[in-house]
Curated annotation (Swiss-Prot):
InterPro entries: ArAE_2_N, BRE4-related_DUF2421, Memb_transporter_dom. This is Uncharacterized protein C57A7.05. It comes from Schizosaccharomyces pombe (strain 972 / ATCC 24843). Residues 80-94, 626-644 have a biased composition (Polar residues). Pfam families: ArAE_2_N, BRE4, FUSC_2. The chain crosses the membrane at residues 209-229, 241-261, 267-287, 328-348, 361-381, 387-407, 917-937, 975-995, 997-1017, 1021-1041, 1066-1086, 1275-1295. The lineage of its organism: Eukaryota, Fungi, Dikarya, Ascomycota, Taphrinomycotina. Its main location: membrane.
Length: 1337
């Protein structure tokens, strides 16, 4: 039997714990062994635990924590016994615990988790030092002792013997087991092999995804039946088909409370629009002189109107005159135009400001458009025009509310709990992926496949943001259960902290992957030789070091370490080649953006002008350094043999260029065009790149030491902690599932509810104890196992003659371990909250909203906070977060009189009118009036009505977007959605009706079969926005329902059936969106590229604010708790940046007339910002773990106590933000790069100097014992994060320069010169002014 112990959730069943006397345990063990049970043991030294029985479907089994690294093979561990490392195999197991695997699983789900009557006692066996492979074979023969043990009952899968008279038959294809296996396989989205746009199908084929589809499908089918029935069709009026369209636009897919609130606002806005149209109709009638119907018809007859059939009576004749446009007059049309303009502008403004009110505003706009298109035709006061749309809309809204209440109803409490379950499952899966990642070598190809961890973290953050919208309605509804909304929110808040801590794991993967990419065996050897040679032969400071006058302080700038460029006498071919190897890898070493991330000029040939990489520019810019002091005036392109200056562009005289010389003899216009097409931007960031190169030459250039061994040790030491964390999350998920399904079971038995609550509480406490003990053992000794590979290096004194071996890999692993411990602490806080809630809420009850509303009002009146803030840490210095800065008006002082105040208010009001959003609102109102002009003219009103021009008006209003990219995207999606929707509508119509005019039973059956698939697309299909799915489904419904309406309850105009309706629908939609598309470019298009660039610049300002708040947080007297306000800002900013990344795909729809839009640079910039935000949050988390003296040492070491260095960081962020917002270029000389000044303090990089006056002196030299200090571990993690923060700020400046360019050229910058400049500026350098190589890491 292999050493596989912990079954997964699907295979776990009937785990039992017992702690009885040794005699009873021995007899139980003998009986279980005799019955043929198989035993698998794990090591444990836990105290005795109460008996426990876990049945299938309930909480998962509990993993016993161990003191040493165990070989516990779980379902989420990818390593097996045969591939364990020797270090892991040499460890012994103490106090093994026996797992009993029985023959029959529990067939049913039971909520009674503890059944002492069925508990069996298995004795614990003595521990032996043995390999994991021998653990299983000796487990059943060892003697018993008093200890704790676990029992798992799993069905036996032993094969039958060959002479068995009844051999096992292969199950048929339609067997129950085979169908279940196929169903589980198809539930996996990866098994479908679908393109990304269709991955929503398998992801939503579950209970959570199908419930809203079933509810919405029944809702639409009922609405279709109302159209088919003659009586209801007639009652709904001439626009009865709007019933089905409304059921598509607003499907019954949301919980009860949001649906009720949206319905309330829908009625409010809809009837407000109707009241506005009634007022317009009254004023238009007054402008006509308030004529009667008879007088109006007589006037039409006098003007030449002839009734087609006078025998039909007066009503028929007046209706024909109205819809032929005989009563359209200029003054009433102007009144209707003004009212339409104002109403459309108002509802568009509300729609943009409050996205949840999207469809209520859309319905109000439709009501206004219907009234404005038909109102000018009526010569008398007719207030029922708006009711043509309001009546079917209100009827369908009532049906939607009924379906929401009675067909698979769902409360916000239930929906929020379901999202918490999803959050728990995804977090558990993320931790399982971590164990898989650590089992692979970074050098293998599998390591890069774990780059998807970043997307998983993004999905977790998006889920948190979705929960925030549901959180608003938790206490606004009636719900029945054990927990109320505030209790669930308290769990979600701790989950938010935990997920932000898990973001560090994805950065760890990228960091390791980056280090493995920049180090290869061939170049490491050459670069290492060049590095040592550079250290031994460079006697003086470099120019870059001498020019860092803006460093930490004046005393530090005088003793800045040398950069170690090429030796002064390095004129041999070997030193030049070694220097070239360093330069070739320099831009990669510190993660400088390369490969088309900078706009560069081409030096090889004109055809390569736009594709020269940043690395090539760096090498060319540094080429003069190799030539020593004899070529100090070499130009940037000295690498080429000859150069020719043509304007501002350096053109090398290469053969490829000379072959194109004849093209310059073309006519002047064509020649200019050719040269303009071949011309590219000049290089940017050359000065920063050279400083990075110098820093790379100075730092030890060594491959990460023992990286594979460190990760192997990390996997073994953290395996037990990962297992316990995953088990705890599985238990939490089962507890949440139980909470959601335990609402009406045994509703009248409080005794059973309390007993079940005690059982649940006992089990959660067991998981809490096991996880807390595993974390304690990990913090005490296991987290320091990774230092063992470095023990021999610290004992070898010869190694430090040139440099100390880089501890970069160790600090990166420390970074991982620190965040792992922080994440586990977050899980423990969640379990603590669950235990507290289980103790306070053992019985189900009815939660009603009036108490929450009353308490909220009382808290606002008294100034006390509600229950939402009871767990928030109230810091005594929270006033420090209040900003003491504010912007000023450079053109005026603060208002000092009533005249100034009134003038200030008026100026602010007029400025607000011409804001971009308000200008767009006025633009949409103008477009609505322009599209309605044919209805305002007497000659075209009848034609416009007969050809359904109203559809074009509605589509034009809805298609015009604020930015050009959105308008182009909407144009394409509406065209394709209308086309395919019309085809589907015709298929449904002709399938149900054949060649006839419509069969009610056939259409009801076909629509009933098709509507679930249509609603599935409507609910779940998203291509950047849900709009394509809405257009597709609405067009299909309109084609079918309007065809039925035209033949069974025809109005004044009948379009036909099937094809006639479909193609008219397509033409009107195409006409409306084409008008909107053209109008979007008038008078001046507002591009999405500008909006995205400005928003990215705004996020940089927010990052600077978070930087300052964390700096203030670190200087507080009490910093043991994370500031929830800062963490909320971090999460909101992360969601904003993530939405900007998704917004970049929308910008691709915008045409680029001046050149290709550099999308990859914006993606890199957003990704860098997202990483920087996560790093700042990680730094705040690390600050909470440090003692005061270590925290002071950290802030001093990383420069956060130096206002000049902090000012430079904020200046870089502000300059980059201002350049992106305005599009202006940046100076060539900026405070960046900041990384070189990060390494300018004396002493070791990861040890703070000069703190002997601290209460407990901190060591100043790196020692092996220091690596066993938890405070130093957190200190090293803080230094690692601080370096990453500075590096990311530098990268932001580099990318911004590549986008905006540079100005203020500094010619002949001293850093470009050779070492003669060093002797001119710094003739002597004392030894204490330099940094010795062994101080560098």
């Amino acid at each position: 039997m292999p050493t596989s112990g912990a079954p997964s959730n699907l295979d776990r069943a009937n785990a039992q714990l017992s702690n009885t006397s040794s005699t009873e345990s021995s007899s139980s063990n003998n009986s279980s062994t005799a019955s043929g049970s198989r035993h698998v043991k794990i090591e444990s030294n836990r105290v005795s635990l109460p008996p426990l029985k876990i049945q299938k479907g309930s909480f998962p089994a509990i993993r016993q924590p161990t003191e040493s690294s165990t070989h516990f093979q779980s379902s989420h561990s990818v390593s097996n016994a045969h591939n364990q490392s020797p270090l892991n195999q040499s460890q012994s197991s103490a106090n093994p615990v026996t797992f009993e695997i029985a023959d029959e699983p529990s067939p049913s789900f039971n909520h009674s988790f503890f059944e002492k009557d069925n508990a069996r006692d298995i004795p614990q066996q003595p521990s032996h030092s043995q390999n994991p492979s021998s653990s299983s074979s000796s487990s059943s023969s060892q003697s018993s002792q008093h200890s704790t043990h676990l029992q798992f009952q799993i069905p036996s899968n032993e094969k039958k013997s060959l002479d068995d008279p009844s051999p096992r038959r292969k199950p048929s294809f339609f067997s129950k087991s085979n169908l279940k296996r196929k169903y589980r396989y198809l539930k996996n989205p990866d098994a479908w092999n679908l393109p990304p746009s269709l991955q929503f199908i398998p992801k939503n084929l579950n209970r959570k995804g199908l419930k809203p589809v079933i509810r919405a499908a029944i809702n639409s089918w009922i609405a279709f039946l109302l159209v088919l029935a003659r009586h209801t069709n007639r009652v709904l009026g001439m626009s009865s088909f709007f019933v089905v369209i409304t059921s598509i636009l607003v499907p019954a897919m949301e919980p009860i409370a949001p649906m009720l609130w949206k319905t309330l606002f829908q009625f409010l806005l809809l009837f407000s629009a109707y009241a506005w149209t009634v007022l317009a109709a009254k004023l238009a009638t007054v402008a006509r002189g308030s004529p009667s119907r008879e007088a109006s018809l007589a006037q039409a007859v006098s003007e030449g109107f002839v009734c087609p059939d006078p025998s039909q009576g007066f009503n028929y004749c007046i209706r024909e005159a109205v819809f032929q446009g005989y009563f359209v007059r200029p003054l009433p049309s102007i009144i209707w135009a003004l009212f339409e303009f104002s109403a459309v502008a108002l509802f568009i403004r509300l729609k943009m400001k409050y996205p949840p009110l999207n469809f209520p505003c859309v319905f109000s706009i439709i009501c206004t458009a219907v009234s404005a298109n038909m109102g000018p035709m009526y010569p008398y006061f007719y207030p029922r025009i708006g009711l043509f749309f309001i009546v079917p809309n209100c009827v369908q809204t009532g049906i939607t509310i009924g379906c929401t209440l009675f067909i698979l109803p769902e409360t916000c409490n239930h929906a929020y709990n379901t999202m918490l379950c999803k959050l728990t499952e995804d977090t558990s899966s993320f931790l399982k992926r971590q164990t898989e990642m650590l089992s692979h070598s970074p050098a293998s190809s599998h390591w890069a496949s774990f780059s998807s961890l970043e997307n998983e973290i993004a999905n977790l953050k998006n889920l948190l943001s979705k929960m925030k919208s549901t959180e608003l309605f938790l206490d606004m509804e009636f719900s029945y259960g054990r927990l109320k909304g505030e209790d669930l929110v308290s769990i979600q808040r701790i989950f938010k902290k935990t997920i932000l801590r898990l973001s560090a794991f994805s950065y760890f993967q990228r960091l390791i992957d980056h280090n493995m990419q920049i180090y290869d065996d061939e170049t490491i050897q050459k670069a290492g030789e060049a590095t040592v040679s550079s250290w031994l032969n460079t006697p003086a400071l470099s120019a870059a070091s001498a020019r860092t006058s803006s460093g930490r302080n004046s005393s530090e700038s005088d003793r800045v370490s040398y950069f170690g460029l090429a030796p002064v006498n390095a004129t041999t071919q070997d030193s030049e080649r070694n220097g070239e190897e360093i330069r070739r890898l320099a831009s990669k070493q510190l993660n400088v953006p390369v490969n088309n991330n900078f706009r560069t000029v081409g030096y090889a040939s004109p055809s390569n002008a736009s594709t020269a990489s940043f690395n090539d520019i760096v090498q060319r810019g540094r080429s003069h350094v190799r030539t020593g002091s004899n070529n100090s005036e070499a130009p940037l392109a000295a690498k080429t043999s000859t150069t020719k200056r043509n304007g501002d562009l350096l053109e090398p005289q290469s053969p490829s260029l000379r072959s194109h010389k004849s093209r310059l003899h073309l006519p002047s216009s064509l020649g200019k065009f050719y040269k303009k097409r071949k011309k590219s931007y000049k290089p940017v960031g050359v000065l920063e790149a050279q400083q990075y190169l110098a820093l790379e030459s100075r730092l030890p250039f060594n491959k990460p030491q023992f990286l594979d061994s460190l990760l192997s040790i990390l996997k073994n030491s953290s395996g037990d902690l990962f297992d316990q964390a995953i088990y705890s999350l599985d238990a939490l998920n089962a507890w949440l599932v139980e909470l959601n399904h335990d609402r009406i079971k045994k509703i009248f038995s409080k005794r059973d509810q309390k007993a079940a609550g005690r059982d649940r509480l006992k089990l959660i406490k067991l998981h809490y104890d096991h996880l807390s003990q595993a974390l304690h053992e990990y913090e005490r000794e296991k987290c320091f196992d990774v230092r063992k590979p470095y023990e021999s290096l610290f004992q070898n004194q010869d190694v430090q003659q040139f440099y100390m071996h880089s501890l970069r890999s160790l600090f990166v692993v420390y970074y991982y371990e620190s965040h792992l411990m922080q994440a586990v602490r977050g899980i423990l806080q969640i379990l603590e909250t669950v235990i507290d809630l289980e103790e306070r809420r053992p019985i189900r009850r009815l939660w009603w909203p009036l108490r929450s509303i009353r308490r909220s009002l009382l808290s606002q009146l008294t100034g006390h906070q509600g229950d939402y803030d009871e767990n928030i840490h109230n810091d005594v210095d929270k006033d420090m977060n209040q900003s003491s800065t504010q912007p000023r008006d450079p053109d005026a002082d603060h208002p000092s009189s009533l005249y100034h105040i009134c003038g200030y208010r008026l100026t602010k009001f007029f400025k607000s009118i011409f804001r971009p959003m308000n200008v767009f609102v006025l633009k949409v109102g103008t477009l609505a009036v322009i599209c309605t002009i044919p209805a305002f003219c007497r000659s075209s009103a009848g034609w416009y009505y007969r050809n359904r021009g109203l559809w074009a008006v509605i589509l034009a209003i809805m298609s015009l977007q604020r930015f050009t990219a959105d308008t182009v995207y909407g144009y394409l999606m509406r065209i394709f959605g209308t086309f395919f929707g019309a085809i589907l509508g015709m298929v449904i119509w002709y399938t149900g009706s054949g060649h006839g005019l419509g069969n009610a039973y056939g259409l009801a059956a076909v629509w009933g079969a098709a509507i679930p698939f249509i609603q599935f697309i409507r609910v779940h299909f998203v291509i950047l926005t849900p709009m394509p799915a809405v257009i597709f489904c609405v067009t299909a419904a309109l084609t079918v329902t309007y065809s039925w309406k035209s033949n069974h309850e025809p109005g004044v105009v009948t379009l036909g059936i099937g094809w006639d309706v479909a193609y008219r629908r397509f033409l009107t939609v195409a006409a409306g969106i084409t008008v909107a598309f053209i109008f979007s470019f008038l008078p001046q298009p507002r591009t999405a590229k500008y909006a995205v660039r400005k928003n990215i610049g705004n996020t940089l300002i927010d990052i600077g604010s978070i930087h300052c708040e964390i700096s203030n947080f670190a200087r507080r007297p009490v910093h043991n708790h994370i500031d929830p306000d800062i963490q909320s800002k971090v999460l909101n900013l992360s969601n904003t940046i993530q939405s900007l990344i998704g917004r970049l795909n929308m910008v691709n729809f915008e045409p680029s007339f001046k050149g290709r839009w550099p999308m990859e640079k914006y993606q890199l910039l957003c990704k860098t910002q997202l990483e920087l935000v996560d790093l700042l949050n990680s730094l705040m988390t690390t600050i909470t773990t440090l003692e005061d003296r270590w925290l002071f040492a950290l802030l001093y070491r990383v420069g956060w106590l130096d206002h000049k260095f902090v000012a430079d960081q904020l200046a870089v962020l502000y300059m980059s933000s201002n350049a992106l917002q305005t599009g202006n270029p940046l100076p060539q000389v900026v405070p960046s790069p900041l990384v070189d000044r990060f390494f300018t303090t004396s002493g070791d990089v990861f040890l703070p100097p000069g703190l002997n006056d601290a209460p407990v002196p901190i060591p100043k030299a790196m020692e092996y014992e220091l690596l066993n200090n938890m405070q130093y571990l957190n200190f090293a993690v803080g230094c690692t994060i601080a370096y990453a923060v500075v590096n990311h700020i530098d990268r932001i400046m580099f990318i911004t320069k590549s986008l905006c360019g540079e100005i203020f050229e500094i010619d002949k910058w001293p850093f470009h010169f050779d070492d003669e400049y060093l002797y001119t500026c710094h003739p002597t350098n004392s030894p204490d002014q330099r940094k010795s190589p062994h101080d560098l890491v």
